[in-house]
From Swiss-Prot:
This is Nitrate reductase alpha chain. The alpha chain is the actual site of nitrate reduction. The lineage of its organism: Bacteria, Bacillati, Bacillota, Bacilli, Bacillales. One of its GO terms (cellular component) is plasma membrane. The keyword Iron applies. It is a peripheral membrane protein. It comes from the Bacteria. GO terms for molecular function: 4 iron, 4 sulfur cluster binding; metal ion binding; molybdopterin cofactor binding; nitrate reductase (quinone) activity. The gene is narG. Its cofactor is [4Fe-4S] cluster; Mo-bis(molybdopterin guanine dinucleotide). It catalyses: nitrate + a quinol = a quinone + nitrite + H2O.
Amino acid sequence: MKKKKRSPLFRRLNYFSPIEHHSNKHSQTTREDRDWENVYRNRWQYDKVVRSTHGVNCTGSCSWNIYVKNGIVTWEGQNLNYPSTGPDMPDFEPRGCPRGASFSWYIYSPLRVKYPYVRGVLINLWREALQTHQNPLEAWKSIVENPEKAKSYKQARGKGGFVRAEWPEVLKLISASLLYTVMKYGPDRNVGFSPIPAMSMISHASGSRFMSLIGGPMLSFYDWYADLPPASPQIWGDQTDVPESSDWYNSGYIITWGSNVPLTRTPDAHFLAEARYKGAKVISISPDFAESSKFADDWLSIRQGTDGALAMAMGHVILQEFYVNQETERFIEYAKQYTDFPFLVTLSKENGVYTAGRFLHAKDIGRKTKHDQWKPAVWDEQTSSFAIPQGTMGSRWDGQQKWNLHMIDEETGEPIEPRLSVLGIEDEIGTVRIPYFSNDGNKVLERDLPIKKMNLNGEETYITTVFDLILANYGVNRGIGERSAVSYDDPEPFTPAWQEQMTGIKKEAVVKIAREFAQNAIDTDGRSMIIVGAGINHWFNSDTIYRAVLNLVLLVGAQGVNGGGWAHYVGQEKLRPAEGWQTIATAKDWEGVPKLQNGTSFFYFATDQWRYEDQPISDLASPIAASSRYKHHADYNVLAARLGWLPSYPTFNQNGIDLYKEAEKAGAATPEDVGAYVASQLQEKKLKFAIEDPDNEVNFPRNLFVWRANLISSSGKGHEYFLKHLLGTTNGLMNDDSDSIRPEEIKWREQAPEGKLDLLINLDFRMAGTALYSDIVLPAATWYEKHDLSSTDMHPFIHPFAPAISAPWESKSDWDIFKALSKAVSDLAEEVDMEPVKEVVATPLLHDTMQELAQPFGKINDWSKGECEAIPGKTMPNIQVVERDYKHIFHKMTALGPNVALKPSGTKGMSWSIADEYESLKQRLGEITSDSVAKGCPNISEAKQAAEAILTLSSTSNGKVAVKAWESLENITNLKLKDLAEEREEECFTFEQITAQPKTVITSPAFTGSEKGGRRYSPFTTNVEKLIPWRTLTGRQSYYVDHELMMEFGETMATFKPILQHRPFLSKRPDQEGKEIVLNYLTPHNKWSVHSMYFDSLPMLTLFRGGPTVWMNKDDAEDTDIKDNDWIECFNRNGVVVARAVLSHRIPKGMAFMHHAQDRHINVPGTKLTNNRGGTHNSPTRIHVKPTQMIGGYAQLSYGFNYYGPTGNQRDLNVVIRKLKEVDWLED
């Protein structure tokens, strides 16, 4: 019989009953009701568990179990069935963090975007226009070509006023804008931005595929985020390849340099702790006492931005003690085979003093060989003459199968012994000029250098080796003259005593750690590691900092060794199933010519930040150079676009479709004819690049899609410039361009445009900053509501996303949204009877193609100045022709096109057939049966089908493809390599398999390490062990980069460059109110969010101050009467932030931290400086583009999407901080 439930009143009367005690009153009998336990049981009950992950660019890519009850996600928990790492190694689990554990809050939060929304002003204009114009394109034209109408909805951005709309209506509006733009201005005025595909590959590929099919450019992100380390392409010819976090455990000595591992790599931090338990020594280099400092045996509190000085001094010690005072055999042999130390460099002589020039090549020494301008020479000790070693860039492309690191002369086939130095065979000890940079003015150092004289081609030629130049550069005392440091106490650049003045670190500590780092490499055979990160990568001169740091791992032979080398972790960059993803994301299966634009250049011009440059580029140039080519940064970008170094979309001041018609009318019958026509029009200045007049309305970007990103409030460096010039809405910019530097190559328009974009379309599941400024917001599915894939460099697995619940309300997955949009575009093209078109497309000179041999010797020849002929694909961009039929966009979007079978697949210069895999996908995915252009193709209409296709077509997830890939590389190198993948040749990952349990990827030449036999992944191990060259000019790791522009800026070798000198205001500034202080403004990663994600979630907001904060040193705050938790204004001419002050002794004096991506929709009051709310963390920022990062068409310095290009750095700036006099929430 069921017990009758008593009322709460009677239950309370139990407290008056006597209590029965036992065991000397150590226990008692109670009669309380235990029904409350059911609440707990119900809370943790569930109907099903689904494996998924988080797509948030945290680099974690952790596997999570999602628990569902009655169709509601109730909680998530860490998955525990990762494959074992093997004996004597810690396992990967547990992986996760409190941020990820709180994600399910978003699904049902007030921030959830549940329906499509359109700005009210815009939707009313659209509805009225449709009543007047039957043709939707004419309806859209009547809005955007009417200045008053366009201004009315653009000025409403960021000010609310959204109304709910129906999917068909919204899709038609977007489609009309897209097709109108295609016909009026050109397809390249429709732009897409979505970052970090590895964090959710299918979602990224959905929009990228759509943009590629309609001819719109995709913007890069890795460089724009300043996550890209440009030094990696410069040194290795590789974007970024780093060890998985488990490889830290193999290390014997670890330096964390600008990387706060416990905070930013939370799921992986246990490996660092475990390595230390095992006996590894850990050094922390950080200005503040960061979380990573608590792991350390030694903490070097460095002055921010001076890391390059410390690294140069450490390099000085290692070179002095382990190369000169006593030659370390392992280091010497490593340097000869795997670095460019023995390669010969030419010298020019003027007034008895020498200057380093370019490499000596086969052409210079009279060797008759293919690509003789791309084969640098060494001095062979065995023959006492020149030799051309195998493995150079020229041998990569000459078809002779000699692209390997065997120490053999490629012409004679004889073994060689490269000489590291010409000292001992020199003809002279001369004086070489070395550029030196400081805030007190750049100057020239004179150093002693051994020099050999040779008569080549009838001319006296002076040569030395890279090794000799490096020793001179570091000021190492070789006993050959008096122009070097006498001891470590000598304040000459770059000694330990010199760096102490720069960094504040005692010279004794520098000597000690440099010795330990090198000695550990000797004792452990190279297991010395440096973990680097955003702390040193977000500066203007991050590449010179990194080169100085990375020289250390090269000097001790640590690179290419498990437990050694560099470990750069900024951004979830490693997309492991690369070839399959690339095929689908760029629509190579159909079109084959994607437009891949570097993001930094795009935003620099689109937001008009180029108009506000105030520091002449000549201040940054080498004191050895006669002068800088230009005074304005933007001029170098124009040069880069003109010479084919960088992409530039929009490309021309003319619609690419109309340009093709003109070329055809002029008699062009082939793509080559079209290229010649375009080149002639450019030379005659009848046609111009759009970048030469970016403020002309015909050159504006018109439609911008943003998905999987919070561009406006997270990554939009120069936030207020975005609001003013790109969006045309209320902004907090306190800068003007009246006294800025004027460019030479760009037309200056006195009135800067405001509101360039016609539409900003955002796909998101939460109403974040970008959504609040968008014209249209489309409701996206969360990570627990769709099929997708994720991978990272931190572990070797590919993780799935899976729908624990169906996408609620009217939300859709990104794949389904772009699929629906492609249908709408095709339907509208049918409705207006849009004919197929042909478009002229310009693409840059690409890395890993023959185009990286386009411009020999690193010499700049500008056809626009008459220095050479304009030749497409050689001295200017490639010119191609692409046909598009907008009626077929939907059919192509949802089918895997025939090019997969007809054309080779590949990556990094390799290629192979995947026709068999294409046929197997027809069987597994089904074929398209509709009577369309896609009939008979594999069906990828669903996201899961697209994921299966990616896994099947990629060498890291399909063993047969991996073997084909290695065979392709064997054909180039004449090495035996496919054994790296043969043991797993029969494996082919499926979505169901990786859902059941994570699988370690297959070893592939798409990357440079090996997972064979359960090995922990470490980069460049296949280069070292298998003798595969690096993809650089010499085929080796580069200490010396000899491009003319690198010489202009004094960066042929690693050096120290101080941070830019920035003043918060120039001629005009707001009135001073009370006490103020000027501080260096840094925006490191946040403890309570991952970028802007989780910042606005209730669980994370409750853990700290519940809104935006700025961290200050307590003494700096005391000087300005600021107390902890006071409201402050943090501002300069770029914008203003209003936040609470967090005072801490862990922050050094002279700097302020504002953790990045604190969105402005949570607890942000107003400021009288702008009479508006405070801005985002990026309001005080403005980007600075660096010319040396624009180089292209030259070996490893050639363009690749997210591979090389100027970074969106933002740290070289200062702000004024003062107490906010009155907190005004602007609610009246």
